[in-house]
Amino acid sequence: KRQGMDGAWLYAKYLRPKKKSRLPLVLQFHGYPGAGRSWLEQCSFVGMGFALIAMDCPGQGGFGYDPGGYEGTTVAGHIVAGLDGEPEKMYYVRLYQNIRILCRIVRTLEEIDQTRVFVNGASQGGAQGIACAALNPGLISRAAILYPFLSDFRMVWELHADEIAYEGLRYYSRWFDPAGERTQEWFAKLGYIDTANFAHLVRCPVLFGTGLADEVCPPATQCAVYNQLTCAKKRYLFEGFGHQEIQEFDDLLLDFFCREEAQF
């Protein structure tokens, strides 16, 4: 455990093979509102010679601690946590600051090859992966991103996709802004955590995957992220797949992380 922002405590699993040479590292980010996968599941990368760090998002389903203290409601999830206060006090702003702290810790690990630090994440983990790469361009050298969450909130709203993972938007609007008088205000604040707004800052190559039948993170909102990437990138579209494990993407990311050159 390490201390994070505003009284938070960061918890992460750290696994590495027994090798004397410096190791490539995968930063693994989990989906919403879960936790890092089990030690057994995380061993797949270790068996291939990678070290792995999997951080639990504070205040979600794992051991990371979040002290709360957000202004306003937390009515239905973390998207709206802090939405009534200043943007820097929103839950996801704090989370991305905590990821910055994690990356500072990574830079101190002598056993890690600092030229081969990769990120991997799906859904909320994909959003964190984009933000991590964007905010730490000198550290992250490759990113594998599958159906990223928290992207293009306005489009989510217009598509009436504010259910399941995005349901906080619907409850917040109905209970605290039923006349729509503050809609522009809270969409502006959500812009601070919109994955699409981080994408143009990413400098490393990105492997990107989208399930075309995804009803949780609609493909159109994922396009908003991919289209803003100005780095080397490659997108795979999986017809018939929703918001679920996509084994073909798993195989693609292994090749992406293992090969010497990341160019597509």
Residue ranges of model-derived segments:
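Hydrolase active-site cap/lid region
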Residues: 130-180, 245
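Short beta-strand/loop motif that positions the catalytic acidic residue
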Residues: 202, 208-210, 214
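Cap/lid segment of the alpha/beta-hydrolase catalytic domain
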Residues: 37, 43-44, 51-97
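Histidine-bearing beta->alpha loop at or near hydrolase active sites
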Residues: 235-254
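Acidic catalytic loop of the alpha/beta-hydrolase fold
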Residues: 212-217, 244
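Short beta-strand element of the alpha/beta-hydrolase
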Residues: 12, 22-32, 52
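Gly/Ser-rich "nucleophile elbow"/oxyanion-hole loop immediately N-terminal to the catalytic nucleophile
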Residues: 78-123
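N-terminal cap/lid segment of alpha/beta-hydrolase-fold proteins
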Residues: 1-20
